[in-house]
């Protein structure tokens, strides 16, 4: 609400909201009459430095005892109040002081106290002086000053009693001034010679609005006083101006409404009110609606005695206009708002009407109800909400007056389906809120007969109505009846699969909240309800929390099943049910602890980050309850607390086991965090490892230090530091990692070194001498010295041969380790020891030396290809990817040095140097910040003044000269740390350095002569390289101080550089740098909204750069800046809708856009006007081709921004900055010579116009096209010259406008089709491009002609003439321009569809499209395949699914054509295609041509679609042997879908599959499930396995089979394991359905036999794998143990090969599969199958934690 008030207040003073907010915080200037005043209180106020100080001065002046000039204080404060901006703190304080409360608080002596009379006199005097200041005639006072006076005076009426009283005494001064001001404002608005810009005209309208509002307020408050005013010009002139304002079409609706109110008040003031109301009741034009609406609003209750009939007549006129203009959104917004205000005034009207006029009251309410019901489901939010409130108000009045007829109207509308379901439900919801539920149920039997059973859980409006009625009925109905009617309906709805379960669950939870105890008894025992429904109800009702323990016992099996079920929502609900409790101190019981263990065991590897975070949050709640149990255990070892301790031990062991090698990221992430929490919990309570009886999983945590994610490394290192006393790491192994070329190895070595340094005991000592003088962290000091020693060696080698150093000692690993260890230390403590100070000094020197060595590489013009001289350049050594694995020194010596190796060494070394220096400056004690006495005595600092200067210059050099992005990005990070320290430094010199650097950078960028030498060092390419980052660091770090001076200084300077347009190469370079820097600043998230005020100028600079730039570098920079600004304005690009439209989050209303950036309206308006004038003049004539292209590029960019805007529902309500202002220019721009410009302009026009404007424009275009058709008909087509650009633009515009209006005006659309059909033939002779656009318009109209009767036979015959044109000519002309003739055949498809003869449709699809002349195999095959897929999808036990249709990516025109077919046509056409011999022959012929063709004219997509199409025919001509043979052949991935469909069809049709086919098909499926294959193919492999398992392999997979094919069972089991560990969730879920549906899962208990016939519950793969393996291994009868071992080896084969180890262990293509875990499960299953088997030898790491 504060934002709304701010916006309204800002509009009152005609200021931008953000600028107005700044005005509120700015200092209030002294009034002009007090500037030279010598009074003390004036001087005190003038000396204030902030608005807060000014407020305090004002209070002191008011309450203090002034020794002199006491009489002037009140006058000064009154002048100051009226001079202060609205909502300013000073004005607010003064308003409080000029009140009775403030007078009562005075403590001054009686003769110096302020009195009410004195304050009122001061206010009255100040108001009089303000009025007199406007009475000056020559020179006239500016409009701005006049508006400020009126706004300030009008504010006296807002919660300011003293101001209201004082203004009442000066009302005679302001009335004539307001009349004069209105005349002046309106004269300027109507004067065409002034050529007002749109924004200036909008400001004048706002001034008019303020003056009108003030005048209405004066008339409403002091009409009696104004009657004493002798100037008769006041009412007459004001009324004349108000009449013009209210009727003028360009006036915003808010201004028109206030002008109309003024007319009504003036009519009452002048005594002509009766004539005024009579005049408004007569038929009027549309522009008189505001005046008629105001006539109703100014009516008083007593006026209805004489004017009730007239009021009804006026209301009827208004409702009639709303029906006629139902598509004009801003009119409906205006009417709905004011009719609702009017309805609120009708409460007292009924009492003043005589009995014979009571019927008029009912008719008035009926008219209001008509409007409300018509618009209650409007697409516009404000209209919909206002109409709902209006209906509610009307029904309340009707109930009070006993008018039952209005209720019956709502009932009849609902029952008769007279309106849309949405409108009927919303109306009935308002009725229920007024009259209750019982009558609605009685009068609307379809509620429970049709609406609720069919639409509950499917339609939002029905859900809202049901909720309102259920809650209302609970207050009146007996519980039994209420439960049976409402709750029973919800229980029935939750069982329907098509319903939205979450919505029904929310309604059930709402019902349970109403009756928690009794409904729980009904809800919980019902086994037919899903568990999620029960849990949602229990968790949503606090009263049931106390019974949660009992509920858990009753639902234990259900909850445990839910914890491992496939439904994510239910899993989280079950976990919430276990861990959440009203009393956090309540201990976990055995059931809860067991269920939590079950959840952790099977959900730890969940790859979803969202679910992982939610689950971790809930488990933390469980650990809090564990904490209370451990505290109780320490106090008194109760059985319950001992169970909690044992649970913690089991949980820690489980988490430790989860850290096995190849565990996926999700398992490691969750396990490390929970393990840390558990260990910290035990440490907090004081329970040791020995007491827990466990050991720290040292080896697992040490392995986690090699994790590819750094935060996992950090957690593992913290756990090892904290709980491990003895380090097992060896220095030789660590230094080998630090010298590795692989950055991941160096990071692992650094973390190992961190753990090594923190250990109290180490297994291997560091090979460096002990420094006895160091007290602080001696082991870390030795480690750093050790790294420094190797750094010296590496630096010496790099100085001699950088290529050899890049292989043998790449430096960055040692630098990273040094930085990492320094991060663990407190640098202030190090400054106290000389050894540490010496080390830091050496490290800084070393870093600068390393940077100087690698700088030539990263600053090279081409860092990626830079190769300095090295000793192995002339050798024939082979190239090797050295990052695949860790290589030894001997192996590295045999590797050839490559530029990539050198660049990796250079930029990562530069990165570590920058980060080390930046962190040292940020954290270390500095010499310049030490006091002089401290420097003389101790010198406790780590960085000297000289080192700081060297570091600063080093960063500036890197950011100015570096070309490699990785290097200067990290230099930016380090430089940011330095700038942050300097900005906050207490040292004056350091604090001034960033400002000096900014000035120097700005001087270099702007190309000043004295900085020309340094400016030449800047990178002119690569988006200015590091220069934008330098400015971003300097500007962004200053924000922490709370000041933005540097930002404003930089932005203004950069914008000036771009706007200055200096010529020459220096000017071009300067503008390029400025554009690139602004791009970085606009993209910076730190600056956020601070850059908003510069965005309009930035957009102008970018667009001007596109037009005026002479070099590609500047145009490129301008394009990048514009792209960044579009993202900043409209948000990050989101996925487009299926129709190709932008996401709504990437669009904005024109009202919001131009409220934020008002100056852009004038810029766009002028630019579009200029371009449109050039279109009319013939395109600029003298401009060269390059200039035309730049102009087109700028115009396209402008249209790209405008295409993201759309009209607001309040368009024209409060502003004249309407998008419709651009439409005339855009229509002319549609005639541009550039195709893209024409298309964009047509799209923008369709976005900007209303439906009425679109219809008018369509009429105009159709008339022009008809004239063109007649002209072409009367003259020879060949001799007629056409401007094809204009014609093509008109057709594009017609296409987009038709998509807006559709068939809302059938007669106009028919005329449009007739005209286009007549024009098609002559247009084909002139231009095939325009002909294609014409046919596209016809296709769009024909697509929408779904309802019968829209097109008659005669019109279809006229349209059919277009398809009778010479097809060869159409094809040849399209080929000449490179246009596909697909559009023409789509036209033919719709033409035959509209004729309504199914056989004709089939003949056209089968025969016409098969003509060789068209060569439209792509279209034909796509259409056939889509129809047959849809036919197969509608069958029972369908071969295809929605995923198959999505896979083939059918075009929109094919999908749209199929949607337009009726259901009968779809079935008939699909069946004809399915049985057609011609289709089969054509398909087989094309497939033969593809196989025999040696050229590449056949696309892979066509081949894949043909393969799928063949399988869907009645007689596909496929043989299983051929398909099985193709399974083993190499072919395109596009053909896999067809091959799989064919296999599944033949497998399903054959009763028995030959044994020779089993293994080839399993091998083929295994090839498809490779993680590198598309997800669709992997899913299809699961479908294939399901078909095999259900139909043909069942005899091999059942228990007790003796003749078992080990290879078959093993291959199938391994394949299913791969599917269960697939990376895609829907593939894993399909595999779960396969296992459970085929009976391949063993379950113990009585239900084992039952499960063979019914589908088993679907559970997570991790929980399903053990029973699956038990089925595949344990239930098969083997006499020989070696057979079991062989089966296990075959199952494990996909996970044990070298390729599998490479694939799964890296976790690149598959992030879910955990190879070691799979093998461990497999070996465990083998052990369960044959307990006699000895424990197998498993490779190292497979069973570390078993």
UniProtKB/Swiss-Prot annotation:
GO terms for molecular function: calcium channel inhibitor activity. Disruption phenotype: Flies are hypersensitive to the cold, hyperphagic and display elevated triglyceride stores resulting in an increased resistance to starvation. Heat production is impaired and flies are slow to recover after cold treatment. The size of the lipid droplets in larval fat bodies are significantly increased and flies display increased feeding. Total body glycogen is also significantly increased in adult females but not in males. Mutants also display an increase in calcium-dependent SERCA activity. No effect on levels of circulating sugars, glucose and trehalose. Together with methyltransferase Trm7-32, methylates the 2'-O-ribose of nucleotides at position 32 of the anticodon loop of substrate tRNAs. Plays a key role in energy homeostasis by regulating the balance between energy storage and heat production. Functions by negatively regulating Ca(2+) signaling pathways that are involved in heat production and maintaining correct lipid storage in the fat body. Regulates Ca(2+) signaling pathways by reducing the activity of the calcium-transporting ATPase SERCA possibly by promoting uncoupling of SERCA ATP hydrolysis from calcium pumping. The gene is THADA. One of its GO terms (biological process) is negative regulation of endoplasmic reticulum calcium ion concentration. One of its GO terms (cellular component) is cytoplasmic side of endoplasmic reticulum membrane. This is tRNA (32-2'-O)-methyltransferase regulator THADA. Interacts with SERCA. Pfam families: DUF2428, TPR_Trm732, TPR_Trm732_C. InterPro entries: ARM-type_fold, THADA-like_TPR, THADA-like_TPR_C, THADA/TRM732_DUF2428, tRNA_methyltransferase_THADA. SUPFAM superfamilies: ARM repeat. It comes from the Eukaryota. Residues 1252-1286 form a coiled coil. Detected in the larval fat body, salivary glands and wing imaginal disks (at protein level). Keywords: Coiled coil, Endoplasmic reticulum, Phosphoprotein, tRNA processing. It is found in: Endoplasmic reticulum. Belongs to the THADA family.
């Amino acid at each position: 609400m504060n934002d709304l008030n701010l916006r309204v207040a800002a509009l009152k003073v005609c200021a931008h909201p953000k600028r107005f907010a700044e005005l509120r915080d700015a200092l209030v200037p002294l009034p002009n009459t007090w500037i030279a005043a010598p009074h003390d209180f004036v001087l005190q106020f003038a000396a204030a430095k902030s608005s807060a100080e000014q407020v305090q001065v004002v209070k002191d002046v008011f309450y203090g005892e002034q020794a002199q000039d006491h009489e002037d204080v009140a006058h000064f404060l009154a002048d100051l109040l009226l001079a202060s901006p609205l909502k300013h703190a000073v004005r607010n304080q003064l308003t409080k002081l000029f009140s009775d409360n403030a007078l009562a608080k005075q403590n001054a002596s009686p003769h110096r106290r302020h009195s009410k009379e004195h304050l009122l006199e001061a206010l009255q005097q100040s108001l009089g002086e303000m009025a007199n200041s406007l009475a000056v005639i020559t020179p006239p006072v500016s409009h701005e000053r006049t508006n400020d006076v009126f706004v300030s005076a009008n504010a006296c009426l807002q919660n300011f009693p003293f101001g209201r009283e004082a203004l009442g005494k000066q009302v005679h001064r302001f009335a004539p001034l307001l009349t004069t001001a209105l005349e002046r404002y309106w004269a300027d608005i109507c004067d065409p010679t002034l050529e007002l810009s749109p924004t200036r005209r909008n400001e004048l309208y706002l001034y008019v609005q303020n003056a009108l509002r003030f005048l209405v307020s004066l008339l409403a408050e002091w009409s009696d006083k104004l009657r004493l005013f002798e100037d008769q010009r006041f009412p007459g002139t004001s009324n004349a101006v108000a009449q013009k304002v209210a009727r003028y079409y360009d006036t915003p609706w808010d201004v028109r409404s206030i002008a109309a109110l003024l007319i009504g008040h003036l009519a009452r003031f002048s005594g002509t009110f009766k004539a005024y109301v009579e005049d408004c009741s007569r038929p009027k034009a549309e522009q008189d609606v505001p005046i008629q609406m105001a006539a109703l609003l100014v009516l008083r209750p007593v006026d209805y005695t004489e004017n009730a009939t007239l009021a009804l007549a006026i209301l009827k006129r208004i409702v009639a206009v709303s029906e006629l203009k139902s598509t004009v959104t801003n009119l409906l917004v205006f009417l709905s708002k004011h009719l609702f205000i009017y309805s609120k005034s009708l409460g007292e009207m009924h009492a003043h009407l005589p009995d014979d006029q009571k019927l008029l009251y009912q008719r008035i309410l009926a008219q209001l109800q008509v409007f409300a019901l018509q618009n209650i489901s409007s697409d516009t939010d404000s209209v919909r909400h206002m109409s709902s409130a209006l209906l509610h108000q009307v029904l309340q009045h009707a109930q009070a007056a006993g008018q039952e007829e209005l209720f019956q109207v709502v009932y009849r509308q609902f029952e008769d389906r007279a309106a849309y379901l949405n409108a009927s439900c919303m109306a009935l919801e308002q009725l229920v809120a007024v009259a209750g539920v019982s009558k609605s149920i009685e009068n609307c039997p379809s509620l429970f007969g049709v609406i609720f059973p069919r639409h509950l859980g499917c339609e939002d409006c029905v859900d809202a109505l049901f909720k309102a009625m259920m809650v209302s009925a609970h207050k009146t109905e007996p519980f039994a009846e209420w439960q049976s009617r409402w709750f029973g309906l919800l229980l029935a709805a939750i069982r329907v699969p098509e319903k939205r379960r979450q919505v029904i669950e929310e309604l059930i939870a709402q019902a349970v909240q109403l009756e928690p105890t009794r409904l729980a008894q009904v809800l919980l025992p019902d086994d037919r309800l899903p568990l999620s429904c029960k849990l949602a109800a229990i968790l949503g009702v606090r009263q049931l929390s106390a019974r949660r323990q009992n509920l858990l016992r009753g639902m234990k099996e259900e909850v445990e099943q839910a914890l491992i079920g496939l439904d994510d929502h239910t899993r989280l609900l079950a976990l919430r049910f276990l861990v959440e409790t009203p009393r956090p101190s309540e201990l976990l019981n055995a059931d809860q602890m067991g269920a939590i263990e079950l959840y952790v065991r099977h959900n730890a590897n969940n790859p979803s980050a969202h679910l992982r975070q939610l689950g971790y949050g809930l488990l933390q709640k469980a650990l809090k309850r564990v904490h209370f149990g451990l505290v109780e255990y320490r106090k008194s070892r109760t059985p319950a607390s001992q169970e909690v301790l044992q649970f913690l031990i089991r949980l820690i062991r489980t988490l430790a086991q989860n850290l096995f090698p190849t565990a996926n990221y999700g398992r490691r992430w969750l396990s490390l965090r929970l393990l840390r929490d558990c260990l910290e919990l035990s440490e907090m309570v004081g329970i040791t490892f020995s007491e827990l009886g466990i050991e720290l999983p040292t080896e697992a945590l040490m392995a986690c230090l090699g994790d590819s994610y750094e935060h996992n490394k950090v957690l593992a290192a913290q756990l090892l530091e904290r709980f491990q006393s003895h380090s097992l790491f060896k220095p030789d192994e660590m230094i080998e990692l630090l010298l590795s070329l692989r950055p991941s190895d160096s990071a692992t070595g650094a973390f190992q070194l961190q753990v090594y340094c923190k250990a109290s005991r180490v297994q291997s000592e560091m090979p460096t001498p002990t420094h006895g003088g160091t007290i602080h962290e001696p082991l870390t000091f030795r480690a750093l010295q050790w790294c420094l020693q190797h750094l010296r060696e590496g630096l010496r080698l790099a100085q001699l041969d950088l290529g050899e150093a890049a292989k043998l000692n790449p430096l960055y690993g040692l630098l990273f380790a040094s930085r990492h260890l320094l991060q663990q230390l407190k640098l202030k403590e190090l400054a106290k020891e000389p050894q540490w100070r010496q080390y830091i000094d050496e490290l800084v020197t070393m870093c600068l030396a390393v940077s100087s060595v690698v700088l030539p590489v990263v600053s090279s013009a081409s860092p990626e290809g830079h190769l300095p001289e090295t000793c192995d350049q002339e050798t024939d050594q082979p190239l090797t990817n050295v990052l695949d694995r860790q290589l030894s020194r001997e192996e590295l010596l045999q590797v050839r040095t490559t530029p990539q190796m050198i660049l990796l060494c250079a930029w990562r070394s530069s990165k570590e140097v920058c980060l080390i220096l930046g962190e040292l400056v940020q954290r270390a004690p500095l010499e310049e910040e030490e006091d002089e006495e401290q420097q003389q005595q101790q010198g406790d600092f780590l960085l000297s003044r000289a080192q700081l200067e060297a570091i600063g210059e080093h960063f500036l050099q890197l950011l100015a000269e570096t070309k490699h992005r990785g290097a200067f990005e990290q230099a930016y990070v380090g430089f940011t740390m330095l700038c942050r320290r300097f900005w906050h430094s207490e040292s004056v010199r350091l604090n001034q350095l960033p400002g000096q650097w900014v000035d120097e950078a700005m001087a270099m960028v702007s190309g000043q002569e004295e900085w020309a030498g340094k400016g030449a060092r800047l990178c002119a390419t690569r988006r200015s390289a590091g220069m934008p980052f330098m400015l971003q660091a300097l500007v962004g770090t200053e924000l922490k101080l709370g000041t933005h001076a540097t930002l404003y200084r930089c932005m203004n300077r950069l914008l000036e550089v771009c706007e200055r347009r200096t010529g020459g190469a220096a000017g071009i370079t300067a503008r390029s740098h400025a554009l690139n820097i602004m791009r970085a600043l606009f993209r910076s998230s730190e600056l956020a909204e601070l850059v908003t005020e510069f965005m309009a100028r930035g957009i102008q600079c970018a667009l001007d750069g596109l037009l005026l730039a002479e070099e590609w570098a500047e145009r490129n920079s301008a394009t990048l800046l514009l792209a960044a600004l579009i993202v900043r304005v409209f948000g990050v690009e989101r996925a487009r809708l299926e129709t190709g439209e932008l996401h709504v989050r990437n669009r904005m209303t024109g009202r919001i856009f131009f409220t934020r950036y008002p100056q852009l309206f004038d810029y766009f308006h002028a630019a579009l006007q200029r371009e449109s004038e050039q279109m009319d003049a013939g395109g600029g004539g003298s401009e060269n081709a390059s200039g035309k292209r730049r102009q087109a590029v700028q115009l396209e960019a402008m249209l790209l921004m405008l295409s993201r805007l759309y009209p607001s529902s309040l368009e024209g309500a409060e502003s004249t900055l309407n998008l419709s202002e651009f439409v005339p220019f855009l229509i002319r721009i549609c005639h541009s010579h550039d195709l893209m410009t024409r298309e964009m302009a047509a799209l923008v026009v369709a976005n900007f116009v209303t439906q009425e404007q679109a219809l008018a424009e369509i009429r105009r275009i159709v008339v022009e096209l008809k004239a063109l058709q007649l002209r072409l008909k009367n003259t020879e087509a060949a001799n007629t010259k056409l401007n094809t650009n204009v014609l093509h633009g008109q057709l594009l515009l017609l296409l987009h406008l038709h998509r807006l209006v559709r068939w809302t005006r059938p007669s106009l659309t028919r005329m449009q089709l007739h005209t286009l059909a007549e024009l098609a033939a002559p247009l084909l002779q002139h231009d095939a491009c325009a002909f294609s656009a014409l046919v596209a318009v016809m296709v769009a109209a024909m697509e929408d002609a779904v309802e019968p009767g829209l097109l008659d036979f005669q019109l279809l015959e006229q349209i059919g003439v277009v398809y009778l044109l010479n097809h060869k000519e159409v094809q040849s002309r399209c080929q000449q321009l490179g246009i596909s003739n697909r559009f023409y055949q789509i036209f033919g498809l719709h033409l035959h569809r509209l004729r309504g003869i199914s056989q004709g449709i089939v003949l056209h699809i089968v025969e016409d499209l098969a003509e060789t002349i068209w060569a439209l195999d792509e279209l034909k095959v796509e259409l056939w395949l889509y129809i047959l897929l849809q036919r197969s999808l509608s069958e029972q036990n369908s071969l295809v699914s929605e995923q198959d249709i999505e896979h083939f990516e059918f075009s929109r025109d094919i999908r749209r054509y199929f949607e337009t077919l009726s259901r009968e046509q779809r079935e008939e056409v699909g069946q004809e295609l399915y049985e057609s011999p011609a289709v089969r022959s054509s398909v087989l012929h094309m497939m033969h041509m593809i196989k025999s063709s040696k050229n590449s004219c056949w696309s892979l997509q066509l081949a894949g679609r043909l393969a799928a199409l063949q399988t869907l025919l009645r007689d596909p001509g496929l043989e299983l042997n051929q398909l099985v043979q193709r399974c083993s052949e190499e072919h395109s991935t596009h053909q896999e879908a067809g091959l799989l469909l064919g296999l599944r069809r033949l497998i399903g049709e054959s009763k028995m599959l030959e044994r020779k086919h089993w293994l080839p098909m399993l091998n083929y499926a295994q090839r498809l499930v490779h993680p590198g294959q598309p997800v669709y193919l992997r899913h299809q492999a699961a479908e294939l396995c399901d078909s095999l398992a259900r139909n043909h392999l069942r005899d091999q997979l059942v228990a007790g089979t003796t003749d078992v094919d080990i290879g078959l069972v093993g291959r199938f089991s391994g394949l299913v394991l791969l599917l269960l560990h697939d990376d895609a969730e829907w593939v894993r879920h399909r595999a779960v359905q396969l296992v459970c549906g085929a009976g391949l899962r063993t379950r113990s208990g009585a239900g084992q036999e039952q499960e063979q016939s019914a589908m088993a519950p679907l559970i997570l793969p991790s929980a399903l794998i053990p029973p699956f393996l038990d089925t595949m291994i344990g239930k098969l009868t083997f006499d020989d143990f070696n057979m079991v071992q062989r089966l296990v080896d075959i199952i494990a084969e996909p996970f044990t090969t070298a390729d599998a180890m490479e694939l799964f262990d890296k976790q690149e293509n598959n992030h879910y599969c955990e190879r070691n875990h799979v093998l461990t499960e497999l070996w465990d299953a083998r052990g369960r199958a044959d307990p006699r088997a000895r424990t197998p030898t498993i490779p190292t790491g497979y069973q570390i934690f078993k």
